[in-house]
Every structure is written in C-alpha cells, then in structure tokens.
UniProtKB/Swiss-Prot annotation:
Part of the Sec protein translocase complex. Interacts with the SecYEG preprotein conducting channel. Has a central role in coupling the hydrolysis of ATP to the transfer of proteins into and across the cell membrane, serving as an ATP-driven molecular motor driving the stepwise translocation of polypeptide chains across the membrane. This is Protein translocase subunit SecA. NCBIfam families: PRK09200.1 (NF006630), secA (TIGR00963). It holds the Pfam family SEC-C. ATP binds at Q85, G103, E104, G105, K106, T107, D493. One of its GO terms (molecular function) is ATP binding. It comes from Streptococcus thermophilus (strain CNRZ 1066).
Length: 849
C-alpha cells in the first residue's frame, strides 16, 4: 500500500513539473502582451482563429492564448492569474480534473482554457451547479470574454427555445448540468431541425465537477408526461397495508438501505389484497406499489430525505448540499408513495418520455474537464468512467489550517452538548464558527440549543436557501456563528473580517462524519483559504449513522472500558480518525459499485437511445421523399406477420393473415380467404407463404400510392411522412423506456437465483428493442394504409406533433379511424385483433392476463 501511495505522489510531482514548464512559457509572453495596445490585444482573438483554421492546433496556440487572457484579465477585471492558476488552466484544457483548494481562484483559472477552446468556433459549455452561479460567473467573466471579442450566452430554464438557441450559438455558454441534459433530451423530441437548440457537444468545463459527475451520477434526467390518475388509489391501499406491518414482517439491510417483506409479511399481503400468490406474474404491478410503500414508510426519513412544505408538497432534500431540489420528484412512483405516507395530495404519476444519466450525458462531449477542491479521493472513478485524471494543483500560499483529530462521544446528546460548549467558548472570544450538519433536523436541534445558550447565529439549510450566498459571505466576520446543512453555499467564498486572523481564523465544526471523505474535506476547506489561519474539528458519537453502519466494535469496547456510566467521556486519537476513514472508504466503495452498475444498465439504453435518436434526426433533416423507407417498413411488417402465422395450423394461419391484411393493409372487402388460398396455392400439405408475401406487398403498394395522391404537393407529402414516422417512434419509444424500467426492477430479483442481472437485462432488453422496432413498423404500416388523409395546415400539424413530442399524451391502442379497439370480448388464446399474428395473451392482453 505504501508503495502505491509513493508511486501516486511521484506521478503527481512529475505532472506538476511538466505543468510548471508550460506555465513558464505562458509567463514568458507577459511583457510582449503588456506592450500591446487594447486594440492590438483584442485583435489577437481573430488572429488565433485564423491560425487555427490554417492548421495550428489549440495546444500550439496555448502559451500565447493564455498570455492574452492573463493580460486581458488584468486590464478588464483587475486580476492577474498566478502561475498555479495557469497550471490549473492547462490541466483543464487537456481534459482532466484540476483539484484546486477553496479560495485559489477557480473561476479566473477557467477563463484561460475556455477562451482557448472557444477559438475553434465549436462552442464551449461552462457548467455550474446552480443558475445563481451561472449568472454570476457569466456576468463577471463575460466582461473579459466580450472585451476579447467572444460572445457569451446564459442558458436558464426560464428561457424560450429561441433564447436558448441564441445562448447555445454563442462562443461560450454558461448553464447548469441539468438544463444542458434536458435540452439534449428535448432536442431529440422535436419534429423539425429548426426547433433544436443545441449544437453538437464540443467542450464542457464543469465547475464543482465532483458534485455533478459523482454525487449526481445516479440521478437520471427525465422528461415525462402524465398517465391515468386511477392508479393513485393503489398508492393509498399499499400505504394502508404497510402501516399494518410489524418489524417482524419486513427486513431492512442498513448498509444498502434496501427493504423487503419476510414470509409473515407476504402472508399478510396475500390476506390483505385477497391473493393466492403475491409474487404471481399477474401481481407484478401490485408488488411495485408495495415495495414503494415499504421504502416510503421505513427507509425514507422526513426532514432528512425530504421535507413537507407549507403548501403540502413533498420536496426532495439533496443529500450532498442540504438544499431542497425544487421541481424534482423521486421517480418510479416513490414520490407518490411518500405523498400517500404523509397524507398530502398524491400527484399524478408520470410516464417517462426520455431519460439520460449525467454519466452518459457528459461522456458525449468531445472533451470534458472539471474543477473541484476535492477530487483526489474519487480519482479511480473519474479515470474509469470519464477517462479523466485528477491533478492536484499546488496552493499559491502554504495551508495554515489546523485539522484536529476527531472527538468521539457515546451518545448524540453528549456530542451536541460538547459542540455547543465549544461554540460558546469561541463565540465569547469573537472567533467565527461554521457548524456543518448532514441533515435538516440536526440543524434545527443545534439551533435550538444555541438559542437556549444565548448564542446568536444564522441557519442555512434546505428550508432556507434563498439567502445562502449572503449568509455564507458573512460567516467569516468577527463573532459570526453559522449553521450550514452539509455544503450549502458551495461556490461562495468565506472571507475573514477585520481582526479575525489574530483570533485563529474561521473554525469549522463538523457535527457528524459524512459517508464520503470528499464531503468532509469540502467542509474543512471552507476554512484556511489563500493561506489564512483556521481550524477544523469533527464531533462524532456511536449513535451517528456512519458509526452504526460501519463503526468498529473495537471503538465501542474502548469506550465501555473507559467509563460505561459517563456519557460525556470522550475519545481523541489518531486510531479513531483512521477507523472512521476506513468506514468511509467502505461506504465509498459501495457507492462507486452502485454508480458503476447504474452506468452498466444505462449503457444498454444508451446504445438503443442513440439508434432511435439517429433515426429521428435522419427523418427530421431529410429533404427527400421518405417513400422508400416507409415501403421498406411495410414490406418488413408483412414478412414478419406472415412468418409469424406460418408456424400455426394452416387454417388458423390463413385466417390470421387475412385479419392482419384487413386491419392493417386494405379495406375489408378488398381481400378474402379465397384470395389468399388461390395466391398461396394451398393444398392439404402446403402453402406458398412467399407468394402471399409478394401479393400482400403489391396490394399495399397500390394502397400507399392511392393514399399519397390525396396530398397535393411534394411538401405536404414529406410533411405527412415525417409526422407519421415521428409520432409512432415517439409513442413506442416512450412505452419502451417504461418497459425497460420494469425489466430492470424484475432482473434485479434474479441475482438471488445466481443469475447475473446485467447479462439478463442486456439479453432481454435487446429482444424488447427488436420487438419495439417491429411495433413501430406495424403502426407506421397500419396508419399509412388506414388513415383518413387530407391536407392540414402546417401550423395544425406542428401543434399536434409538438404535443406528442413533449410527452403530454394519453397512450391507447386505436384503429386506423381513430376508434379504440374493443379488447373486452377477446379470449386469451384468440389471435390479437391488432393483427400482430400473436395470441392475445402474448400481445395486447399481456397486462390483462
């Protein structure tokens, strides 16, 4: 282990030497740039663009370009990047993670690689964790970029598509990670290229990169629409059931936070819902509601995982920032289960129209880089998932902060009393204190204790984040006491007030260790910025969640031996700190494995998503007649259906083909059973199914030609073809996403049967994808053949399709005339009326049976 650490340190030192060499080359241009007039310095941008067009690479332009930005920053912003900031900029340009401590000027560092990469004209995205920081940084740094002749755009969620398009067309675009992801998904739901807002993804520089690419990695971005509200009753019934259970009826796995029914719980469920077998295939949907109700009632904790707003809404609490996540909902029905648990109105369940994880979103950029104060602990993940190295950048001044060893108490009460005593001592002498908590309820408890102790303070948590930047900025003033949930206010520096340096600087007190060392380091990093003095101290108890989940029995035994009766006894030792870090490493390993598994599942969907999106883009951008594509779909549908029926008894097969032809290809009186028998040269022993395929294809071609003649112009024909294909593809893709979600839940259970869930998911999802392609082609065929075609205004078609594209649809199976097919009288072994050639129980009756 020591050898590995030594090798890592040596590699970092070697990298730093290379960076210093390039940085010195940048610095060598300083005098030459300073001698230029404003106009001459500004003209450098156009010169660089021309040199790039003539074949010079960005790497070759780097020293001069960085020097131009340094001189421009001095003239426009009054700031001149240090050598360590130049080094950080080089790391970012190379597509790696620059680990720079708090207060080292990451925002200014970013200007150099952003400017250089904007020279290509392909666009640069600067990604921030919230819109406040996007607007702040775009305004402050935008002055410099504009002065140098580059355009700057801000992409906000409130902007119209036209405004977003304008922002993305700028040389440099500031945006949040979620908005870039949602825009990508929405771009792949439009029906015309001119409605897309993004350009091809070129270079992204992500601020607080660990927050976006690590903490948010398991969070999918989802565009969805409502489904029937009748299912809401099932949420209430499932909630009522799980509230009747005792602790013996279910099992919770604390490390993984999973829950499931025991045998007694299963028996109670079967009795409650009047079932013979809870896990029969017919009850898959019900078990999903029960699982969510179990999680909502026994895993998800109020004021930790979510809060109930005064407006009776469930608001998610971000576990890494402590902020409420406005507009975000737990997916897959969990949010509705929590609403049922808390007795607030259950909102309509939604159906996913498009989704993508942050991991696959950002891996689509040609080049990706990021900045953070704490990335080294996650270096393996950055390298393996994103192919990014983490390079620690030296501080401009030596760090003076004193990090004290952890203090461990036996109970929460003893720990919190000690925290208040420490705060009181520091407050009395005027030293500012920042108290970090991991949960809203802890913030509220400490706040109450400080009030009782007569200590004035500010509270910054998920219930009060509007003023967070202002509160954090003042947290370094003399006598200031601030309670902050986790890393609320991240991105805003804490500057020390007058006389605070002499008092020892800002003291950061952690009331609990987070499961990630990185989050603890972020809290510590709020103190001691730019070489200022400071302190950090963590208070722990054996009742903390991390200690309960992974705490060493050795620590518990030491406490018991010291004094079993005195809960105020405290342990302070390096051994304790090492034990805690060992526990954190285990949790980090579990979390990494989970994120890696999420990526493995999403990679399957990514491949399918890219195929569908590429096909959509081809249709959207097509200036040609799409007749060859549609006729090919019709032919494949005919061949697939005839082949499917040909495996049945001869009489049944011919009747099935006849039903298909009448329902999907031609008017009912245009074909008979006798026609098929004649064409198929039917004898008692054989049928020429190939001849039937040719016959049906000829009939379909004739119908297609008649349908198209109803449209009077080439433009109208292309418009109809595009609308037809896109509406069907979008509907089927939405259903497919939902089916993949259900499949993922189902295969997860197969791990218990010694099957590899990922392999099962890959295999079955591929088959489902093939089935979806077949369903798309069938629906295009049927709609093309059976639709009542007439000229519509372009605006009407736009309105109709845009409604579908946003997922705001009610899905149902309808015949070509828009009438719903009546499935109520179809037997389970009858052929499905949709004409697929499958038996009803294996087709549209699958959910019913």
């Amino acid at each position: 282990m020591a050898n590995i650490l030594r090798k890592i340190i040596e590699n970092d030192k070697g990298e730093i030497k290379k960076l210093e060499k390039t940085a010195k080359k940048v610095e060598s241009y300083a005098d030459a740039m300073a001698a230029l007039s404003d106009e001459e310095l500004q003209a450098k941008t156009e010169e660089f663009k021309q040199r790039y067009q003539n074949g010079e690479s960005l790497d070759q332009l780097l020293p001069e370009a960085f020097a131009v930005v340094r001189e421009g920053a001095k003239r426009v912003l009054g700031l001149f990047p240090y050598r360590v900031q130049i080094m950080g900029g080089i790391v970012l340009h190379h597509g790696d993670v620059a680990e720079m401590r708090t207060g080292e000027g990451k925002t200014l560092t970013a200007t150099m690689p952003v400017y250089l990469n904007a020279i290509s004209g392909e666009g640069v995205h600067v990604i921030t964790v919230n819109e406040y920081l996007s607007e702040r940084d775009a305004t402050e740094m935008g002055e410099l970029y504009s002065w140098l002749g580059l355009s700057v755009g801000i992409n906000l969620s409130s902007k119209s598509p036209a405004e977003k398009r304008e922002a993305y067309n700028c040389d440099i675009t500031y945006s949040t990670s979620s908005e870039v992801g949602f825009d990508y998904l929405r771009d792949n739901m439009v029906v015309r290229k001119e409605n897309m807002v993004q350009r091809p993804l070129n270079f992204a520089l992500v601020d607080e990169v660990d927050s976006v690419l690590i903490d948010e990695a398991r969070t999918p971005l989802i565009v969805s629409g409502p489904v029937s509200s009748e299912t809401n009753q099932l949420y209430h019934r499932a909630d009522a059931f799980v509230k009747t259970l005792t602790e013996d009826d279910y099992a919770i796995d604390i490390p993984t936070k999973t829950i499931g029914l025991n045998d007694s719980g299963i028996d109670k469920a079967e009795e409650f819902f009047n079932l013979e077998n809870l896990y029969d295939i017919d009850n898959v949907a019900l078990t999903h509601y029960i699982d969510n109700a179990l999680r909502a009632n026994y895993i998800m904790l109020r004021d930790i995982d979510y809060v109930v707003s005064p407006e009776q809404e469930i608001l998610i609490v971000d576990q890494f920032t402590g902020r409420t996540m406005e507009g975000r909902r737990f997916s897959d029905g969990l949010h509705q289960a929590i609403e049922a648990k808390e007795g607030v109105p259950v909102q309509e369940e939604t159906k996913t129209s498009a989704s993508i994880t942050y991991q696959n979103m950002f891996r689509m950029y040609k080049k990706l880089s990021g900045m953070t104060g704490t990335g080294k602990t996650e270096e393996d993940e950055f390298r393996e998932i994103y192919n990014m190295r983490v390079i620690p950048i030296p501080t401009n001044r030596p760090i003076q902060r004193i990090d004290h060893d952890d203090l461990l108490y036996s109970t929460l009460d003893a720990k919190f009393r000690a925290v208040v005593q420490d705060v009181k001592r520091r407050y009395d002498k005027g030293q500012p204190v920042l108290i970090g908590t991991v949960a809203v309820e802890t913030s509220d408890l400490i706040s109450k204790m400080l009030v009782d102790a007569g200590i004035p303070h500010e509270v910054l948590n998920a219930k009060n984040h509007e003023k967070e930047a202002h509160i954090i900025m003042n947290a370094g003033q003399r006598g200031a006491v601030t309670i902050a949930t986790n890393m609320a206010g991240r991105g805003t520096d804490i500057k020390l007030g007058e006389g605070v340096l002499e008092l020892g600087g800002l003291c950061v007190i952690g009331t609990e260790r987070h499961e990630s060392r990185r989050i603890d380091n972020q809290l510590r990093g709020r103190s001691g910025r730019q070489g200022d003095p400071g302190e950090s101290q963590f208070y722990l108890s054996l009742e903390d969640e991390l200690m309960r989940r992974f705490g060493s029995d050795r620590i518990k035994h030491v406490l018991e031996r010291l004094n079993a009766d005195d809960e105020d006894i405290v342990i302070k030792s390096r051994m304790l700190t090492r034990q805690v870090e060992s526990a954190q490493k285990r949790v980090e390993g579990n979390n990494y494995d989970t994120r890696k598994q999420v990526l493995q599942y999403d990679d399957v969907m990514r491949e399918q998503r890219e195929i569908i999106y590429a096909e959509r883009y081809d249709v959207i951008t097509a200036e040609r007649d799409l007749e060859p594509e549609i006729k090919a779909m019709i032919k494949r549908t005919i061949n697939r259906t005839v082949d499917g029926h040909s495996r049945n008894d001869q009489e049944e097969a011919l009747k099935g083909i006849l039903n298909f032809a009448r329902q999907a290809l031609v008017p009912e009186d245009a074909i008979s059973l006798e026609d098929l028998k004649e064409v198929g040269e039917v004898t008692k022993r054989s049928v020429n199914y190939d001849a039937i395929k040719v016959y049906l294809t000829e009939l379909a071609d004739n119908v297609y030609d008649r349908q198209i003649k109803k449209l009077r112009s080439e433009e109208a024909i292309r418009e109809f073809q595009k609308v037809l294909i896109l509406m069907v593809v979008d509907n089927k893709w939405t259903d497919h996403i939902d089916a993949l979600d259900q499949l993922r839940n189902a295969v997860g259970m197969r791990g218990y049967a010694q099957n590899n869930p990922i392999v099962e998911y890959q295999s079955e999802s591929f088959k489902m994808f093939q089935d979806m392609i077949g369903a798309i082609e069938y629906d295009v065929t049927r709609t093309m053949m059976k639709a009542q075609i007439h000229e519509q205004s372009r605006e009407h078609v736009n309105e109709r399709v845009s409604t579908t594209a946003t997922g705001n649809i009610q899905a149902h199976q309808a015949d070509a005339n828009g009438q719903e097919i009546d499935f109520s009288k179809v037997g389970r072994n009858d052929f499905c009326p949709c004409g697929s050639g499958k038996k009803f129980k294996n087709c549209h009756g699958r959910k019913q049976f």
